[in-house]
């Protein structure tokens, strides 16, 4: 039985993650392969648009943030695991704006996987594969759903279809021989600046509904995949679980503002490292460092360790200081 399935059972189906911290920590990764959207894009959309999207600066070298994204920071905690940036042979197929489906431009996540395998790409037992997506499906579906007679009934198929895409991608990667897959669910979308204020506020409940619908279906899909692919460790990093904690008490994580966007489309705030959000939906460099630390904890400690680390301020601070020190030059801090 896969670790994801055991972890979900032990947590009474509340969270899918590795169940044995020691086993997770012992895993060695030689390469990182990334499929996803703007939260993982390290400059791919910027390159294909001739350096026009996103506008850099103020965006950082084609990232949808003011610094490196979390997948570039994995592995900077010395002694944990080998995947990270820079890592020889690592591959990033993520594109800003990508949905989970087979859209042509920017390449949807199904197409990202097809492009990788079509070019002869393979997966190995020591690969760490990061898969994160679904938000763009929901963002693009909310306007029409919100204007319909049944907003929840209209957005639910969008969320469920995105989760089905994710299941397909994860299952395909596992069947192709990947040793470990880190799948990230969606945070509580209603707490992002795009939906927690201004014109987007009325859509906040619908965004939350869509996100939880997606997350529930994603978990079910991952459990089924875990049962069918016993040789792959499938780990779900639960961003939703920490959303309210982050919003309610950002100081625990070294932040002062988890509500507003640092960059409002015209001006940049004076203290971006104290903000969780860079723009309406994307994390700041500080936010990405936080996600990277959380990912490290999930990969090394498993669910229980990750949960305790997030909620334990002292333990969190020790790891935060270590990671910040090792990534300062990369992030320009």
Regions found by a protein language model. Give the residues of each.
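Conserved active-site regions of diverse hydrolases
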Residues: 3-4, 13, 18, 23-333
């Amino acid at each position: 039985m896969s670790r994801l399935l055991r972890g979900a059972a032990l947590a009474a189906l509340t969270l899918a993650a590795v169940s044995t911290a020691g086993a997770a920590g012992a895993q060695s990764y030689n390469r990182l392969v990334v499929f996803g959207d703007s939260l993982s894009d390290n400059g791919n959309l910027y390159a294909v648009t001739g350096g026009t999207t996103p506008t850099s600066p103020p965006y950082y070298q084609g990232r949808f943030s003011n610094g490196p994204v979390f997948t570039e920071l994995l592995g900077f905690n010395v002694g944990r695991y080998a995947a990270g940036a820079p890592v020889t042979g690592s591959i990033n197929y993520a594109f800003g704006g990508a949905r989970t489906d087979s859209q042509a431009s920017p390449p949807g996540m199904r197409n990202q996987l097809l492009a990788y395998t079509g070019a002869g790409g393979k997966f190995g037992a020591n690969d760490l594969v990061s898969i994160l997506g679904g938000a763009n499906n929901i963002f693009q579906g909310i306007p029409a759903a919100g204007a319909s007679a049944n907003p929840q009934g209209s957005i639910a198929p969008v969320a469920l279809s995105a989760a089905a895409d994710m299941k397909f991608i994860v299952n395909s990667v596992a069947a192709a021989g990947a040793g470990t897959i880190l799948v990230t669910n969606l945070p509580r979308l209603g707490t992002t600046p795009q939906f927690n204020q201004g014109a987007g506020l009325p859509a906040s409940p619908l965004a939350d509904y869509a996100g939880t619908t997606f997350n529930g279906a994603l978990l079910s899909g991952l459990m089924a995949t875990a049962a069918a692919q016993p040789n792959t460790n499938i780990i779900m990093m639960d961003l939703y679980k920490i959303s309210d904690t982050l919003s309610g008490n950002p100081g625990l994580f070294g932040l002062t503002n988890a509500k507003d966007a640092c960059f409002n489309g015209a001006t940049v705030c004076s203290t971006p490292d104290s903000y969780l959000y860079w723009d309406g939906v994307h994390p700041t460099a500080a936010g990405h460092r936080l996600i990277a630390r959380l990912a490290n904890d999930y990969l090394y400690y498993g669910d229980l360790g990750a949960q305790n680390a997030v909620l334990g301020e002292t333990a969190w601070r020790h790891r935060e200081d270590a990671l910040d020190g090792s990534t300062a030059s990369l992030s320009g801090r």
